[in-house]
Amino acid sequence: MLNLSIVIPAYNDIRLGKCLKSIDENVEVVVVLNGATEEVKKIAYSSNAVIGELPTPNLAKAYNYGIEISSKDNVLIMDSDCVFMPGTINKLFKLLDAGSLAKGRVMFSFNSKIGKIIARARHIHTCKKNAYSPPLAFNKGILAKVNGYYFDENLSWTEDYDFDIRVQSASLKILYDDNARIIHPELSIKQDLKSSFNYGVGHARGVLHKKNGYYEPKNKTRSIIDSYKYIKKKYGYSTAFYLIFWQIAFYRGYKKEIH
């Protein structure tokens, strides 16, 4: 068995079953039932995973609890609605021989024109070599270097952004393998813009808690225009136009929470 625990928070997505089936290595699997539905609970308990339960959804708390009850020295954070491509787990685990953190790539599925635009927009947000999850693997020994905690449970929806800030501040090296990939199902416009709204809420909470790296958005119109020009040149009109609405949703989420 690899010295690795895969931590998967699960709430209401029955695709957890496909996620579990995509695990192609002998590893410890920890499923944290994050205020989960009965259907998701049945899927989890019918597997060979170590099960933890939280009464109400809190992704950061689910990550922390999963890490706490895991028994291996290394953890791999995964989403319940995604699946591993063959070899991904082993690729990320091997990277940990040379560094404390390892990151792979999220591939966003699409079956429609708008789905393709959303997938491209998501790629822009997730292609950087940072400590956002998933797929993110790291050694538990980094704890002391990231201020003594992994994920801030007060920061819903932006807990990995805060984690990345502390990782970067500690000058911890993040190793990256573009071939270590997971597949994310297609997102609808409603789902994606709701996520953007929630990221805005999470960012506002970071500002209210005076977290490093969180800032009050200023010059919103200028920011939208500058982003549009850059993205249009690099990715095309459709993606740039869509991301205007994405940014507006983010700002609305921020405004709702900050007031």
Regions found by a protein language model. Give the residues of each.
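Non-catalytic, C-terminal membrane-associated alpha-helical segments of glycosyltransferases
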Residues: 195-202, 206-259
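Conserved donor NDP-sugar-binding/catalytic core segment of glycosyltransferases
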Residues: 87-115
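Acidic donor-binding loop at a coil-to-helix junction in glycosyltransferase catalytic cores
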Residues: 156-165
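A conserved acidic beta->alpha catalytic loop
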Residues: 32-41, 79-82
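Active-site donor/metal-binding and catalytic loop motifs
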Residues: 176-194, 203-207
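Short aromatic/hydrophobic "clamp" motif used to bind/position activated sugar donors
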Residues: 75
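Glycine-rich, basic loop-to-helix element that forms the pyrophosphate-binding segment
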Residues: 54-70
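Short, well-formed alpha-helical segments that are part of the catalytic scaffolds
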Residues: 12-25
